[in-house]
Amino acid sequence: MAADDKIEELIREIAAKHGIAVGRDDPILILQTINMKLMQDSASAQQEILDAFKSELESIAHRWGDDAKGKAERTLNAALAASKDAMTRGMQEGAKAAAEAVRREVEAVTAQLVAPIREARRVAMMNMVAAGMAVVAAGLALWASL
């Protein structure tokens, strides 16, 4: 019914503007009907093309999002790996420094104890010699008393 209203409106407009009476069976109205049909078909085809384009754009945007997410994950993983390596190196360097400090302390204490150990060894040797002499003297005293 809407198409009939449009045709009636068109007939009135032609009569008002151009002063010509046009009937429903006039060839000019056939052209108008064909033109309206072509425009409807064109609009439908354009809508289908727009829908396909929209779908393709959404697909591309989704792929870009996935790509960006993948790149972000790879970047984060690389940063984490680099951080882990740096922490490991730092811990190794700290352990080496601590071991070196302990070694130097042990060497310093050992160097300080060398002289007292020598002195203790000398005193022990003298005690052993004195003990040996006491045993020999006791042995001589025992032999002399027999």
From Swiss-Prot:
Origin superkingdom: Bacteria
Sequence intervals crossing the membrane: none
Pfam family, one: Activator-TraM
InterPro entries referenced in this protein's UniProt entry, alphabetically: TraM
Annotated keywords: Conjugation, Plasmid
BP terms from Gene Ontology: quorum sensing
Family to which the UniProt record says this protein belongs: To plasmid IncP-alpha RP4 TraM.
Protein name: Protein TraM
Annotated source species: Escherichia coli
